[in-house]
């Protein structure tokens, strides 16, 4: 894990320290599905663009990432956008998530299959999950990408079976290099 942290720290040290807010199209495309208030968890938040966007929508957001530098960029972004987020530097391999603690859990461009069950149990009843990351088709254009970090076709629907699917692209189309799921928890 230490090697991963150092790699991400280097990435964010080299990044623009004051980026413009970039809203993830999956989130902005599902505004009608979001509650206007509630608690949100942004996993592998990086420089916190999704966290800041969700805070602007009225959520109390906790942004979690292994990179303290990325989270510092995110706090500055939140301040510039005149909103507030909470941040936590943590190893997502080791982090436990409280049961039924969040109305919304989001995770973009990060794949940790061990988190899947923790993300589901962290959702409150009727809570919403957003997950989007690279799938196996990404390897055609990026053959050096680690194949352990891509989703297989059908993996999301199988992993999140039992949730109410709102939007799902599960890697069937070889021209689409990311898979995503938007699903509601009903317990």
Per-segment meaning from a language model:
Residues 74-75:
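Conserved SAM-binding loop
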Residues 1-35, 38-46:
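Conserved class I S-adenosyl-L-methionine
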Residues 81-92:
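Conserved SAM-binding strand-loop segment of SAM-dependent methyltransferases
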Residues 127-134:
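Conserved beta-strand signature within the Rossmann-like core of class I S-adenosyl-L-methionine
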Residues 171-187:
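Core SAM-dependent methyltransferase catalytic element
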Residues 67-69:
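Conserved SAM/SAH-binding beta-strand->alpha-helix loop
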């Amino acid at each position: 894990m230490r090697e991963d942290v150092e790699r991400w720290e280097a990435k964010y040290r080299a990044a623009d320290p004051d980026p413009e807010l970039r809203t993830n199209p999956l989130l902005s495309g599902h505004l009608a599905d979001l509650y206007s208030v509630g608690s949100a968890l942004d996993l592998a938040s990086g420089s916190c663009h999704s966290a800041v966007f969700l805070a602007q929508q009225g959520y109390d957001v906790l942004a979690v990432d292994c990179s303290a530098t990325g989270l510092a960029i995110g706090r500055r972004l939140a301040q510039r956008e005149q909103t507030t987020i909470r941040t936590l530097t943590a190893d997502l391999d080791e982090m436990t998530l409280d049961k039924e603690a969040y109305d919304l859990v989001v995770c973009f461009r990060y794949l940790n299959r061990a988190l899947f069950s923790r993300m589901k149990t962290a959702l409150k009843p009727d809570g919403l999950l957003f997950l989007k990351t690279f799938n196996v088709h990404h390897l055609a254009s990026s053959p050096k990408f680690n194949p352990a970090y891509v989703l297989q076709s059908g993996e999301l629907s199988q992993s999140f079976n039992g949730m109410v699917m709102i939007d799902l692209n599960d890697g069937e189309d070889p021209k689409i290099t990311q898979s995503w799921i938007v699903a509601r928890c009903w317990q």
